[in-house]
A protein has these predicted regions:
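Polybasic, Ser/Thr-rich amphipathic helices
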Residues: 1-8
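STAS-typified acidic loop motif
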Residues: 12-48
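Amphipathic alpha-helical interaction surfaces in cytosolic regulatory modules
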Residues: 42-114
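Short acidic-hydrophobic, aromatic-tinged amphipathic segments that line or gate anion-handling sites
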Residues: 116-118
């Protein structure tokens, strides 16, 4: 069992052993929180994208807790941007607890202006 009482699913590491993402999901009514641990990159972003696509039909709020995210690539940014677009007419999306490396990427790319950051 995972932190939120759900079965944990983990992305398989890449052949280089460097790409790994653990996604913990919590649902509270129509609010979904995703706690990301590891790297959100080309290898791991499809798993998060699939989870987002599963919940957006019922979601009024998506929260991404990035307190344990070590790295985010352009592929990861695209997934978060897609989530923002999916929630545009339905509710809100929040990104919180950015680590320093992830915060730098958000600032350098201008994504810090696109998201609600807590």
């Amino acid at each position: 069992m995972g932190l939120f009482g759900k079965k944990e699913k983990k992305a398989a590491p890449s052949t280089s052993g460097k790409s790994y993402l653990d996604i913990k999901e919590n649902k509270d009514g129509a609010e979904y929180t995703f706690l990301l641990n590891g790297r959100l990159d080309t290898i791991t972003s499809p798993e998060l994208d699939a989870k987002i696509n599963e919940v957006t039909p019922d979601a009024e709020k998506l929260i991404f807790d990035l307190s344990n995210l070590d790295y985010i690539s352009s592929a990861g940014l695209r997934v978060l941007l897609g989530a923002t677009q999916a929630m545009e007419d339905k509710g809100e999306m929040v990104v919180r607890n950015l680590t320093e490396p992830v915060k730098e990427v958000f600032e350098l790319t201008g994504f810090s202006r696109l998201f609600t950051i807590e």
